[in-house]
Amino acid sequence: MSDSVILALGIAAFTVIVLVLVAIILFAKSKLVDSGDITIDINDDPEKAITLPAGGKLLGALASKGIFVSSACGGGGSCGQCIVKVKNGGGEILPTELSHINKREAKEGYRLACQVNVKGNMEVELPEEIFGVKKWECTVISNDNKATFIKELKLAIPEGEEVPFRAGGYIQIEAEPHVVNYKDFDIPEEYHEDWDKYDLWRYVSKVDEHIIRAYSMASYPEEKGIIMLNVRIATPPPRQPDAPPGQMSSYIWSLKAGDKVTISGPFGEFFAKETNAEMVFIGGGAGMAPMRSHIFDQLKRLHSKRKMSFWYGARSKREIFYQEDFDQLQAENPNFVWHVALSDALPEDNWTGYTGFIHNVLYENYLKNHEAPEDCEYYMCGPPVMNAAVIKMLKDLGVEDENILLDDFGG
């Protein structure tokens, strides 16, 4: 065989090998790399279907088309709120989802939208209320301290717009990359003692990505044109002083009147039941927000005659806020009473009211002698330790799960 023939055969063989490898790569790319447009059918309604380029996660794909699914953690897979039903497509459920979705739900197709890859056509089922969710660019009206570690952020909604929320609902607030220096916070002198004691002024919050977090509303539907939040600054725990501070709470605390803020909503499921049962509200810390929203809505908008009481736990007297508002509601409504318990009253407080943890105070001074505590509805929001203690106490009293309503935000 001549050299020219051997060379030709070698070139041909090499070409075949290259073509085969290219074919393999293209095949693999078609399977592994997202490309082209895909269609997501929603709720079996052709008018709700969306078409968009493949790639990314389902949560982001929906948001890009103006469909905002609740995600308090901003798509990190930790809050478990963005649950949707995937009827077709999306691949197998991931281990990261199984802490929020049980086996029965997984079998029925429930997934976390933030974990579902958008690689091909899909069919999903979304709650109808999601289609009422919108985005607004709001303006900061005020951002004042109500307690040592709690600010009341008041936002103006764009003129002519309305956020159609229900009492107990929440919104999501967004922030672009930023740097916040705690030394720049505007904090009244009366709250400086703890800030100086723990040298909280030293902290800096640096965020390199777009973030989203959820906050319960302190306002109620009749307060038109505004959204009010109670935001607790998330400083590092004493045992981990070098841990980074909370990203969104730091951002919110840095806001000043006139600043622009993007929110989306409304969301929520912490709504009052439409019954005549007695309502018992239990709150602590920034868990005040949904308590205020609910109680104001019941008494000011609905003019409810249901028997209701509010039990709020604070450390000391200067941590009590909205006191005049609740005092006035109590004076005007014979069906409503409210109580505060201080867990760490200061000598200068000259406090003569309840002391101790709020779950103990509620039990010893009311529920222990209540003729039917299991028939009441309990609405609570506060620090995790408080929530757990209240729930245990209610369970011991025979209260069923359906009458224990918990807001996981605001504590």
From Swiss-Prot:
Keyword Iron in annotation: yes
Cofactors: [2Fe-2S] cluster; FAD
EC number(s) recorded for this UniProt protein: 7.2.1.1
Enzymatic class: translocase
GO process annotations (BP): sodium ion transport
Protein name per its UniProtKB record: Na(+)-translocating NADH-quinone reductase subunit F
Chief location bin: membrane
Upper lineage: Bacteria, Pseudomonadati, Pseudomonadota, Gammaproteobacteria, Pasteurellales
Species annotation: Haemophilus influenzae (strain 86-028NP)
SUBUNIT field: Composed of six subunits; NqrA, NqrB, NqrC, NqrD, NqrE and NqrF.
Topological type in the membrane: Single-pass membrane protein
Top-level taxon of the source organism: Bacteria
